[in-house]
Each structure stands twice: as C-alpha cells, then as structure tokens.
Curated annotation (Swiss-Prot):
Pfam families, per the entry: Aldolase_II
Signal peptide positions (record): none
Gene3D superfamilies xref list: Class II aldolase/adducin N-terminal domain
Full protein name: 3,4-dihydroxyphthalate decarboxylase
Positions bound to a divalent metal cation: 86, 105, 107, 173
Gene it is expressed from: padC1
Annotated organism of origin: Rhodococcus jostii (strain RHA1)
Lineage: Bacteria, Bacillati, Actinomycetota, Actinomycetes, Mycobacteriales
Amino acid sequence: MNETDIEGARVVVAEACRVAAARGLMEGILGHISFRVSPDLLLIRCRSADDTGVAYTRPSDIRLVRFDGTAGAPGELDNGYQVPKELPVHVESMRASPDIRAVAHLHPPSIVAADLAGISLRPIYGAYDIPGAVLARGGVPVYRRAVLIHSTQLGKEMVTAMGDRPVVICRGHGITSVASSVQQSVLQAASLEELARMSLAVVSAGGTLVDIDDADWEDLPDLGANFNTGAVWRHEVARAATV
C-alpha cells in the first residue's frame, strides 16, 4: 500500500472503532481493531497519554507497527503511543491465513454472558438477520481460557480454537472476529452480539432455543455485499456519529 492508501486505512480503522463502541461491542478504553497493510505491517488502534476511549478514536490513534510490535515507520510510536498488550491476537490471526486482513478484538457483553451461561450461539432466527444466522449455522467456537492474550503462545492457542471460523469467543473475556475487511470484522461481531442478546432474552422468558427449520434456508438468500456490508456500514457510521 502507498502512503495515501495507508492514510485512508487509518480513517477506516478509526471509524470502525467508533462504530464498535457505539454498538456496545467495546467499552471505555478496552478493545482494538487492526488492518494488515503488508506481510509484516499492520495498522492498529493504540493508546496514548491523552486517550479518551475507543468511542472517540481518531485516525491519529491508528498507528503503523510491525508484527514484532516495533514502529512500522519513523514516528509511529512517538508521543506516548503504545501498542496493545494483546497484539498477539492480531498477529497470530493474520499469520494463520493471508486472506485475513482485518482483526477486531472486542468485549461484547451479551456474547460473554451467553457463553458463561452455557448458551451456544445457534441460528434461532432467519430473516431477522440473515448474515448472523449464516454465521451461527457454521458454529461459533470457544477459546476456553479467560486470559489476557499477551503472548505468542496464547495467541496461537486462540487461533487453534478458532479453526477455520471467522469468530471465536474468548471465555470470560470477549471475542476475536477476522475478515478480509475492517467493516466485515465489526459487522460479524455486531450480528453475533445481537444473536446472543436475543438468545438470553428467550431463555430469560422461559423459552427454548431451537434452530430454524432446514427448509427455511432455501429462502434466506445472500443479499450481496452492497447491502450486507455497504448499506449497513453507511448506517452504522452515521449512527455512531450521533451516539
């Protein structure tokens, strides 16, 4: 990527942080999103001495770093900027596949609560959120250690638990969502958080969680990227600006 592309990507990652915060997927100063710009360089949300939280992320908070945590270019870690302690979440996820360019490590409360309650996220609804139902149909794995993923070894453990799925629940912690785009990594997380919220509500009301009928999948089409990502993302960005 050239310098212009990198600057544009900073804007997108910062935007994604604000969207995730507005959606309640991360709170306060916790959580981070990244985007790979070359085989060993990524843009990632870093903290600084004047950080006011993820909901107020600026493009200048998105810093270019190497996979080893050092500055990716002169000045990138100046002015008190620090790489997240859980950088291995991002690095090991990206190392697992060249198709993974974006990683969102978030703390969605309903997902954490549902997992702790022993509730598996399954496709209990269809047209309410087709991408979310499809995601759940393939299964959502769980990394069963409630640790800060601050080492290469722990990052590899998480990636192993994730397997070939785009999202893994980190028990008592949060989730990691991976995708080819920053937007998709956040939208996947938002869909699963809504599914978890709905599942908790059904169980709390005394209901039973049941997968939709197999026959219904024939009439749950892929509405395409222009709708599922493009239109939805424009809404999320506009919504985040008003929260």
